[in-house]
């Protein structure tokens, strides 16, 4: 049975990376074999502008490589800090801006399908624009008010609704990291149990 892939995405500063680290530790303590795919946005080469469609293509390829390694490893669960769905979400946004075609976006989606990489469960963490800016300590050059508002409106508000994958959406504004962790741990274990049951049924057919 291939591993259960859980992808984290969401508003900047909503707690994605912190949640991934905490959940990985807890799941391993419970006996799960856990893989991790770190966010590739932090290592984009200088030749690709951060926040550009070309930069997103590079991140897509890097994420695909790491995911392909993990699904062929001995894992029960793979936690992904921004992966397939996040990449497709940005393609959707760049297409709306006229920077990327829907045809190219579909090619990217087909590529993931061709190599057998599929997100099984989405964890979308969100916070309001003002809270994101507060947690960052101010607006950045790329991650500014306009960027965050567009992300929450287009990706959290519109794109995710069209994605036919089991998901949870959690506003972390008034929650501590521990509260977020505890809630997500239960949601992930519940979804993983269903995944195992469905996989076992398919193998018996």
Language model features with spans:
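Walker A (P-loop) phosphate-binding loop of P-loop NTPases
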Residues: 13
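Conserved lysine of the Walker
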Residues: 16
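Hydrophobic positions on the alpha1 helix immediately C-terminal to the Walker A/P-loop
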Residues: 19, 23
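Conserved substrate/cofactor phosphate-moiety recognition/catalytic segment
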Residues: 24-69
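A glycine- and Lys/Arg-enriched "phosphate-lid" helix/loop adjacent to the NTP-binding pocket
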Residues: 90-157
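NTP-dependent small-molecule kinase module
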Residues: 137-205
